[in-house]
Amino acid sequence: MRIAYSGPGQGTSLHRASALKRLGHEVTIIDPWEWLGRSKWVSRWAWHTGGLGFEMRINRPLLTAVFAARPALIFVNQGEFLGPVLLRRLGSLNVPIVNYTNDNPFAGRDGMRFRLYRDALPRYSLLAIAREESLALAKRLGARDAMRVWYTADEKAHRPRLIDPEVQEHYASEVSFIGTWMPERGPFMVELIRRGVSLSIWGDRWQKAPEWQLIAPHWRGPGIYDDDRYAAAILSARICLGLLSKGNRDLHTSRSIEIPALGGLLCAERTSEHLVLYEEGREAVFWKDAQECAAVCKHLLEDEPLRQSIARSGHERALRNNHFNEPMLAAVIERAMHGYGALR
């Protein structure tokens, strides 16, 4: 099936587009960022204004590119730049239009970023949403159809692999966290440091943390966006922290799936969804606060056989859970086509 895929041609968006290709679809990637420019100012403008003026830049070229692809389905990744005018015009193709978002467009963390998404929401055939609570909110805003999906790992990007010894030495760590700074994360990290946890952090914006002076010695570098280096950092750590975004009201995140899929040991906040995903103490370890997290980490670092056993069992559970891109996307496409009455 021909699919016009609107989304970045990099990162996890590219993972999803590639997974659609592995499922046998003919995918044309149409990246809105090409017409906006890849600049931090684009993201800041979206955050503050909801993308005011973006439609004038992207509507015509994106519409032209989609029509040229002659799709049987349009797949929109995130969709924060696509407003109702563009969606109405895309609707003239008379094919299902699907939106997948792994952020929370109904929370306040991202400012005005998802203004256009919310305005255009009723024009999608199907929304694939990563949070249960968002389903009711989407319906309230006029969604035609919405389905809840779990976060996913990618079959290729997040498969276990051997790491070059030099690369492994570069990323070697006792307890690692890979992720962007958020206000609640600074105090958490400082508490771990104060309790003697040997911590390594990779991620952007940590210099903004009020606690930066204490965190700086443990910051190993900016965010890791290369698939092989991300895998190396996970597999070179004895314990991998999976922190949630309070502003996004997370109960699990992509890290919750990716870390065990790669074969790393997941150490994350105890939530209802994490407890569904993994058996505590056997397939992953959980905590309620920094104090418990520090105690759990120290215990595991002193018991290597137990640490290896949990990492191994967590990987096996991740495979059984099957929260990977290909089955998730296959289910989304099937529902969209069936719901649209256009199975072909």
What are these language model-derived features?
Residues 97, 175, 284, 298, ...:
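Short amphipathic alpha-helix in glycosyltransferases
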Residues 339-344:
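A cross-kingdom feature marking charged/low-complexity
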Residues 1-47, 54-65, 69, 77-85, ...:
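Nucleotide-sugar donor-binding catalytic core of glycosyltransferases
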Residues 89-92:
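Acidic (Asp/Glu)-rich catalytic clusters
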Residues 302-335:
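A charged, aromatic-enriched C-terminal amphipathic alpha-helix characteristic of glycosyltransferases
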Residues 98-111:
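A short, histidine- and acid-enriched strand-loop-helix "catalytic/donor-clamping" loop
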Residues 253, 284-290, 299-304:
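Conserved acidic donor-binding segment of nucleotide-sugar-dependent glycosyltransferases
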